[in-house]
Each structure stands twice: as structure tokens, then as C-alpha cells.
């Protein structure tokens, strides 16, 4: 094994590092011909080279990277892992369960400990129950701790018992913003040895960290657990798409508008499973916060990551966010020596180059059901109206032409009566790390609110307004600048530091509005500064959801409707009866920049992050036991020991793939929200019945996301989204299917199949599993007895999660679909999987019905050799436990 370590001295300190320049000479390649992300992967392989997980062949293959047709796979070990609590609780539950399994099989509980640093940020549990007043924040936090006491006690136990594990307490910030502003070192200095920060996160928007020059992406909790326990993550060497940015953003456009445009454009380029790198002269004009907004939305454009290389702006941001001067100097020196510092004169070899003219970006929103459906602001009214009557699907609601005329009169207790019409803005939320990490758009929203209040405008009480920033720094500069009182005046009071509306924790609508929506079947809207707007995600009563920049969120709240052209119609009328237009109160770019210069300072970051792990008194007061193994509470409805290790043996699993029945048949764009919802638990659902049988009242249901530590709730919640459309349910929308001629909840049908020893298959269209990195979408399917998913295409993370839970992902061959093969879903299926399957094998499937048997071929979506090992072990979790017990 050749040693490629080099040394340099900076400020009289000696540092060591893996020298890519030295290694590239040995392999006779031009280092600067490689994309930055490939160089980061190479450094990792050289550093982790052990001839077991990482071989010389892996290194050679990557050094000779062929951008036009990459071959081979990467065994990648990230530097660290970050968790949020919705996905983090099941990760810690699995670790605790692994400890039990190890002990039961004669091993030590200490075999199960994270081998790399792990940070858990608790941000997904706070809900917007209270809003629109000064007490909302405290009231929501009190309720959050009350609802989640069991979960928080469990996470506190984990902090005490596991090595290499820290928890950022509730009411501190949003995972990706805290990661960007505080947790990431960009370049890690471990006892004088330097290497790039790289990471996995159990949240798809982990990609935000690529804005600061750190390679990272979202993985399922299962893959994160494996990485934490020392396993490499195997994936095909990716294509790298270069996105050349040129020109300059117009004064009226924001980073949000750019991110939405990038999402639209790259979705059309089909960058799923590919790396994206941004370069070009336009890069210099983008602040780091702008880059982070674009990087955050990589899951929406489908890429594994959207990477911005380290440059002067990276260092400026590190200084702003109070990283030490010594570490900033070290970051620059290391990045330059290892050719990881952006070089404008060099063009790496990309698979393809896509060009985006920044000067052509216009104020926009996206919706009503997908982030990639971009609408220029001037066309928003026209597009909203068209979506109402367009055929039901990802861009339409399939309603009648009379829908626009629908309205209801809302009666308030104080005697006030207000009219609510189709398109009413029921929710206006400044939310999500995507935008609240960006001072430009937050201060723009504050300045717009100031000008609106000064003109006498107000927001109707039928609109639920909220402000939930991703860090305390945001509220600090909004207060310091004097803008928060104006936001408060319009109802955008602080409701919490967490994901809230962006992930479906929007709370109930204004009760009077909710009543009107249900009684009149009104189609109402949400406008949020989030990153996802899939149907049913934001609020079950809100069908049309639009992503917008924070200033546009405030503007739509003032207008009160999405059935309006904000570029030509007034938002309202001032105290003199004069019309007030958006252009009248939208702040000028120079004004916003002057506020940033005055009020966004390193001192704020120092103050707010100085004691981030110990500041929360509520968290500090939680008492927990001191034990290596968790003492499971059998009556808990939040935390239960999952059954993944009940049949743990040393033999590999043989899985019968004959006589499979179809549990569900879906169309295109089925998201992980559809498969495993995170939001409210519907009153008439199987999960609700389980909770009620265990003494939980409706008021205490909490959300699916908060109950991910209990497999009994989660398996009942699988395919239970109220908006999911199963083609086997005779037109009934929601989590239903046909079982022996009867329409049943999918959970009940699955249990009937299991009771009778029948395994199942799910059939789907394109982009199956798009959206959040939700491992429960695979875990739940596994517990329901699903053995195979056959789809036209898969989103990257979900395909990986399926394999890691022992579910076989099969893909229709190009040009074939369930429809073209005339598959109804009422057949019985047999998959002829070879005894020794290989990556991307073509396998035969038989579908038998009364009419006879159809045979067709499909693509086996094992994308790496590791997938085969995971599948043959019944999943990665049993495999890891076996390895630990065998001294691996």
C-alpha cells in the first residue's frame, strides 16, 4: 500500500494530509481534469484504503474516471453523519435493538457504537398549534415537550450511552441550517491530520451542505446506521453534470427564484442519481447563502448533490459564521494544495454541461403539487385557474369550470363575517432551512412587511400565518434591525425553531376556515417558503400548495388569495383608499444589502451558537436511566423494539418470490410522503385504531413522524396517505386496496395476505419513492410483507432503502409499462431470480390470471455488488449484526 501522505507547516503547526497531486502523478492523470466531487471521493478512498472494503482496483477505477461513461462502484465512508429526530428516533431504536440482539447472541453491547461522529438535531417535532401572537413560541414549545417526552427521554438516553453522539436540543434550529452555520468544519483537522468534511444525513435536504463546499447527501436511516457502524456505502461511480452559471441575478429576483428555476431545468435534464457541480462566471455573484438555497433543493431536481466548490466566498461565510481565523486559513491552504479550491481557469471533464443565464431569472412560484412546476409570477393566476380544470394528476385537480365561483361565509365569535373563496390562502408560512438560512430573503420579507404596515395593509384573520426560522441567528437579526415588530403586526410571529409547515407540521387551519372548507368542499391554498409541495403534505385540507420566497409569502398573505396576478393587481388598499401594489412595497436590492451589512454579524453567530448543546433548560431537566441496553416500556406507543432481528441466524436468507399478489398498483410520482406520511394521523385510519385501542385519545395522536419509533404505528401508516391513489381501489382515494373483492385499508389486506402465507408485490410508474429520504417507506413495506416493487423508475434513496430492507427493486425495460404489458394488478406474479444474481441482470417475470400467463423481462435494480449482499442477508441490519458478532 503506497503512502500518499504529505506534510506542510502553517503558523508554526505541522499538518499531514493525503496528497492528491502526488497520487495523480503515480496514476498518470491530470488531477484538474477531474470534477471536484470525484477528487473528494478519491481522497476518501486513498485515506480508507484497506484492501478489504476499499481496494486498489476501486482507486484505479476512480482515478481513470470516464466522465462520458463512468464504470465501477465507489465504497464511500463519510466523515460523519447527521440525523433529525423524525428519522433519528428510528435510527437510535435500531441501534438499541441491535445491542439487544448482540447481547442475546453472546456479544457485548459495546460492539454497537457509532464509529464516526454523529449529531442529532431535534427540529421535526414542533407543530404550529399556536400562531399570530407573542405567546405562540412558548406555547408551541411547551406542547412539543409535553407530546414528545417519551421520545426525548429516549434520545437523551442515547446521548448518555452511545459514544461519538451529540444532540442539539429542541427549539434551537433546523438540522441543515445548524449544520451549515455551525456543525461543519469544511476541512476536518483530526489531531493534525486534515481531510475534507463529508457526510450522510437522514434527511434528503442534507444536500444543503454542498453550498459550503462539503460533499454530502441524504440517505435512509438504514444506510446511515451502517455508515455509523463502519460500513462503506457502495454506489455506482456517478455521472457529473456541470452547470455553468453566467450573468447576474436581476434586482427583482431572489435565490428562491433561482433555486426553483434550477429545479425545473435540471428535472428536465434527468439528473437522478447523478452529481451536479456548479461553475462559471456567475458563481462569483452568488452569496454562500444563495448557493446553499440552490444546493438544498438537489432532491427536488433529482440529483444526489448540487456541489459548489470552496472559494473566497466560502471563506467569507466561515468568517461571518464565527469559524476561527486559524481554521479558515487552514481550510484555504489545504484546499489549494489538494486542488479542491475553485479555479476559474480550469474546466473539469463533465458528463454534460448545462447552461443557466442568471440574468434571465424572474420572480416565480412553484406548484400546485410539485416543486419542479415553475410558474412566473405574472402567469400565476392564469396557471392556478388552469390547474383547477386540468385532468386530475400531478398538475391538475380535475374539477368543473364552476369551481372558481365557489365561496363560503366564515363567521367568527366576535361577530365578524369574512368571505372565503376558491384559492383562498389558508396558510402563509415563512418556513424551512431552504430560505430561512438566507438573510437576503428574510430581510426582504421584513422590509416588505414594514412598508405594508406603514401603508395600513393587514392580513385577514382567515389566513394562518407563521414564522419558523432555522436558527436563532435569524430572529436575532430581525429583532436587531427592528423588522420583527412589522412581521408580528401581519401575524408572522415566531412559532418555533424547526421544520413546521415545510414537513406538514402546519397544525390545524383557522377553525372557522377549516369548517367552511369541509362543508363546502372548497379548494384552498398554502403559500410557503419551503422545498416541497406534494399533495397532502402541508395540510390535509389544503390541496393547492405553492413554494415562494419569503417576501412573496408575505405578499400572498396580504392578498389573501392565489387567484390573483400580483404583478398587475393591488395587494390591498391603504388608509386613504389608494391601491397598494407589490412593486410599491418590494424593497430595493440596495436597501436589503445595507440591512445585511449592518445587522448580520459574526457576533450574532457567536452569541447564538456559543452554548448550543447546553442552553435548553427543558432538555437539561429530562431525566433518563443509565444503562447500556434500553429498558423498553411495553405499554409505550412511541418507542418499541422492532422485529428485525427476531430470526437472526448465521445463514443467508432464501426468499420465495412465487405466487405474489399485488398489494397496490400506482401511477407516476408516488412520493415517500404517499408511502409513509409524516403528518397528521387520520381519525379513521388503522394507526388511529391501534392508538385508541392502547388508550391514546385523538388529541394525543401527534403525527406519524413523531411515532416512527413504534413499528406498530408505522406499518399501519404505510400507504395510508389520504391522497394516495391505488388503481386497485375502484376509484377510492386514500390507503385502500381490493382484497378478495372487498375494498379494505391496505394494512388490513396486507395482514390477511400474511396470515395466509402470501407475499406481495407493488407495481408503480415513474419516479417511485421520490421525495424525502424516509426509510420507513421501505421498512413499512417490509413489515407489510412486500417482497418486490416493480416500477418504471425509482428515486435514488428509496431504491437503496428497499434493497437494504430486503425488498427486490425491479424496473420495467425501456418502453414498457404496466399499461403496455396490459397488467391489471389482479394477476399472480412469480419472479425468476437467479441463485447468484448480478448487478443489472435481466430477469423473467410471470403474471398469471384467468386469461392465462404473460411472461416479460425486467431490469434487476441491484446497482452495486453490495446490494446483492444486503438482499441475500435479508437486509443490511441483520448483515451488520452478524458481522459484529463474527468480529468483522
From Swiss-Prot:
Binds 1 [4Fe-4S] cluster per subunit. [4Fe-4S] cluster binds at residues 433, 499, 502. It is an enzyme of class 4 (lyase). CDD domains: AcnA_IRP, AcnA_IRP_Swivel. GO terms for biological process: propionate metabolic process, methylcitrate cycle; tricarboxylic acid cycle. It catalyses: citrate = D-threo-isocitrate; (2S,3R)-3-hydroxybutane-1,2,3-tricarboxylate = 2-methyl-cis-aconitate + H2O. Belongs to the aconitase/IPM isomerase family. Monomer. This is Aconitate hydratase A. It comes from Streptococcus mutans serotype c (strain ATCC 700610 / UA159). The lineage of its organism: Bacteria, Bacillati, Bacillota, Bacilli, Lactobacillales. The gene is acn.
Amino acid at each position: 500500500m503506497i503512502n500518499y501522505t504529505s506534510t506542510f507547516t502553517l503558523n508554526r503547526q505541522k499538518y499531514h494530509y493525503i496528497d492528491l497531486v502526488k497520487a495523480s502523478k503515480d496514476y498518470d492523470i491530470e488531477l484538474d481534469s477531474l470534477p471536484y466531487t470525484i477528487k473528494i471521493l478519491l481522497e476518501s478512498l486513498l485515506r480508507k484504503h484497506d484492501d478489504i472494503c476499499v481496494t486498489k482496483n476501486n482507486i484505479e477505477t476512480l482515478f481513470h474516471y470516464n466522465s462520458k461513461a463512468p464504470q465501477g462502484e465507489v465504497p464511500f465512508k463519510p466523515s460523519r453523519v447527521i440525523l433529525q429526530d423524525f428519522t433519528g428516533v428510528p435510527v437510535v431504536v435500531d441501534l438499541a435493538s441491535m445491542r439487544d440482539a448482540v447481547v442475546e447472541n453472546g456479544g457485548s453491547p459495546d460492539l454497537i457504537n457509532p464509529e464516526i461522529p454523529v449529531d442529532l438535531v431535534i427540529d421535526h417535532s414542533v407543530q404550529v398549534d399556536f400562531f399570530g401572537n407573542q405567546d405562540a413560541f412558548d406555547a408551541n414549545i411547551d406542547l412539543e415537550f409535553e407530546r414528545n417526552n417519551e421520545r426525548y427521554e429516549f434520545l437523551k438516553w442515547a446521548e448518555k450511552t452511545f459514544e461519538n453522539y451529540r444532540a442539539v436540543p429542541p427549539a434551537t434550529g433546523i438540522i441543515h441550517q445548524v449544520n451549515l452555520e455551525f456543525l461543519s468544519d469544511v476541512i476536518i483537522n483530526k489531531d493534525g491530520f486534515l481531510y475534507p468534511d463529508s457526510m450522510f444525513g437522514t434527511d434528503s435536504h442534507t444536500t444543503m451542505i454542498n453550498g459550503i463546499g462539503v460533499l454530502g447527501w441524504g440517505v435512509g436511516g438504514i444506510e446511515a446506521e451502517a455508515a455509523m457502524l463502519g460500513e462503506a456505502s457502495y454506489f455506482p461511480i456517478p455521472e457529473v453534470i456541470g452547470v455553468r452559471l453566467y450573468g447576474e441575478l436581476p434586482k427583482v429576483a431572489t435565490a428562491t427564484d433561482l433555486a426553483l428555476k434550477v429545479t425545473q431545468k435540471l428535472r428536465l435534464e434527468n439528473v437522478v442519481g447523478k452529481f451536479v457541480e456548479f461553475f462559471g462566471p456567475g458563481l462569483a455573484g452568488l452569496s454562500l447563502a444563495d448557493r446553499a438555497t440552490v444546493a438544498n433543493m438537489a432532491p427536488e431536481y433529482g440529483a444526489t448533490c448540487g456541489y459548489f466548490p470552496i472559494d473566497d466566498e466560502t471563506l467569507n461565510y466561515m468568517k461571518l459564521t464565527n469559524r476561527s481565523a486559524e481554521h479558515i486559513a487552514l481550510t484555504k491552504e489545504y484546499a489549494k494544495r489538494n486542488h479542491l479550491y475553485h479555479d476559474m481557469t480550469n474546466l473539469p471533464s463533465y458528463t454534460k454541461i448545462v447552461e443557466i443565464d442568471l440574468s434571465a431569472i424572474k420572480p416565480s412560484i412553484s406548484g400546485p403539487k410539485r416543486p419542479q412546476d415553475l410558474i412566473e409570477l405574472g402567469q400565476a393566476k392564469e396557471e392556478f385557474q388552469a390547474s383547477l380544470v386540468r385532468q386530475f394528476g400531478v398538475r391538475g385537480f380535475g374539477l368543473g369550470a364552476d369551481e372558481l365561483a365557489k365561496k363560503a361565509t366564515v363567521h367568527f365569535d366576535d361577530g365578524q363575517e369574512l368571505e372565503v373563496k376558491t384559492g383562498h390562502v389558508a396558510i402563509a408560512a415563512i418556513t424551512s432551512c431552504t430560505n430561512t438560512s438566507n438573510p437576503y430573503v428574510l430581510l426582504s420579507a421584513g422590509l416588505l412587511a414594514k412598508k405594508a404596515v406603514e401603508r395600513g395593509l393587514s392580513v385577514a384573520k382567515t389566513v394562518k400565518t407563521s414564522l419558523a426560522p432555522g436558527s436563532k441567528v435569524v430572529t436575532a437579526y430581525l429583532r436587531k434591525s427592528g423588522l420583527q415588530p412589522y412581521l408580528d403586526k401581519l401575524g408572522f410571529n415566531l412559532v418555533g425553531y424547526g421544520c413546521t409547515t415545510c414537513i406538514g407540521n402546519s397544525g390545524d387551519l383557522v377553525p372557522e376556515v377549516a369548517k367552511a372548507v369541509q362543508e363546502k368542499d372548497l379548494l384552498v391554498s398554502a403559500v410557503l417558503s419551503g422545498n416541497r409541495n406534494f399533495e397532502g403534505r402541508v395540510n390535509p385540507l389544503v390541496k393547492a400548495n405553492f413554494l415562494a420566497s419569503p417576501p412573496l409569502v408575505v405578499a400572498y398573505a396580504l392578498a389573501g388569495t392565489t387567484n390573483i396576478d400580483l404583478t398587475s393587481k393591488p395587494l390591498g388598499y391603504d388608509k386613504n383608499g389608494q391601491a397598494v401594489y407589490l412593486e410599491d412595497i418590494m424593497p430595493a436590492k440596495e436597501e436589503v444589502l445595507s440591512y445585511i451589512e449592518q445587522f448580520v454579524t459574526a457576533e450574532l453567530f457567536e452569541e447564538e451558537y456559543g452554548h448550543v448543546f447546553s442552553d435548553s433548560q427543558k432538555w437539561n431537566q429530562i431525566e433518563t436511566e443509565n444503562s447500556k441496553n434500553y429498558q423498553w416500556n411495553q405499554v409505550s406507543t412511541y418507542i418499541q423494539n422492532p422485529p428485525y432481528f427476531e430470526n437472526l441466524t448465521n445463514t443467508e436468507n432464501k426468499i420465495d418470490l412465487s405466487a405474489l399478489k399485488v398489494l397496490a398498483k400506482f401511477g407516476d410520482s408516488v412520493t415517500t410522503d404517499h408511502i409513509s406520511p409524516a403528518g397528521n394521523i387520520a381519525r379513521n385510519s388503522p394507526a388511529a385504531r391501534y392508538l385508541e385501542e392502547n388508550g391514546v385519545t385523538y388529541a394525543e395522536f401527534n403525527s406519524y413522524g413523531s411515532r416512527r419509533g413504534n413499528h406498530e404505528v408505522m406499518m399501519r401508516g404505510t400507504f395510508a396517505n389520504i391522497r394516495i391513489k391505488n388503481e386497485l381501489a375502484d376509484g377510492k382515494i386514500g390507503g385502500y386496496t381490493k382484497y378478495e373483492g372487498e375494498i379494505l385499508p391496505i394494512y388490513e389486506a396486507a395482514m390477511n395476505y400474511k396470515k395466509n402465507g402470501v407475499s406481495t408485490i407493488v407495481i408503480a410508474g415513474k419516479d417511485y419513492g421520490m421525495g424525502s429520504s424516509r426509510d420507513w417507506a421501505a421498512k413499512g413495506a417490509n413489515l407489510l410483507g412486500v417482497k418486490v416493487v416493480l416500477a418504471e423508475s425509482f428515486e435514488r434513496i428509496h431504491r437503496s432503502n428497499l434493497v437494504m430492507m430486503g425488498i427486490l427493486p425491479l424496473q420495467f425495460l425501456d418502453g414498457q409499462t404496466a399499461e403496455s404489458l396490459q397488467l391489471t394488478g389482479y394477476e399472480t406474479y412469480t419472479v425468476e431470480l437467479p441463485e447468484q444474481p448480478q448487478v443489472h441482470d435481466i430477469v423473467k417475470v410471470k403474471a398469471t390470471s384467468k386469461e392465462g400467463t404473460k411472461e416479460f423481462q425486467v431490469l434487476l435494480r441491484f446497482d452495486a455488488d453490495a446490494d446483492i449482499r444486503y438482499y441475500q442477508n435479508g437486509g443490511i441490519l441483520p448483515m451488520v449484526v452478524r458481522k459484529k458478532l463474527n468480529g468483522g
